[in-house]
Amino acid sequence: SDGEWTLELYVFSPRPLDDLLIEPNMPKLSLFVKAKKRALLINDKPYTAVSHDGRNEIIYKELPLLQGWNKLVIKLGAGDRNDFTGYFKCDNKKDFLPLLKAAFVNPETK
């Protein structure tokens, strides 16, 4: 839509985060986004599970990343461009976050 902008990033996870049944104590990864208009796609699928949904910010919870590289697309409103903040957090396993890698170009096409 008019003036909306898209942030595309690739996130590498050393292990799959999409199957709680296999591993009950799996890292739970959240994505905090500060923006009034926002939408998240993970590997081209809209993702809507949230633990917090405020007027100015949202926390997407338990991101179902696959092992290896994952494509994340964050769509933001035009007015959010200068005020956007985003970061990952892992509430239950502090040592997991440093294992993630992020890139702004697809590492698998290089």
Describe the predicted segments one by one.
Residues 1-3, 21-25, 32, 55, ...:
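Solvent-exposed loop and beta-edge segments used for protein-protein assembly and interaction
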Residues 13, 35, 76-78:
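Short beta-strand segments enriched in hydrophobic/aromatic residues
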Residues 35, 39-61:
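Solvent-exposed beta-strand/loop surfaces of large extracellular or lumenal domains
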Residues 3-5, 27-29, 36-40, 82-84, ...:
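Short beta-strand/loop motifs in extracellular/secreted proteins, especially
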Residues 1-25, 110:
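Extended carbohydrate-recognition surfaces in non-catalytic/accessory domains of CAZymes
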Residues 61-110:
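An acidic-aromatic loop/edge-strand motif
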Residues 17-41, 72:
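Aromatic-lined ligand-binding clefts that engage carbohydrates, nucleic acids, or primary amines
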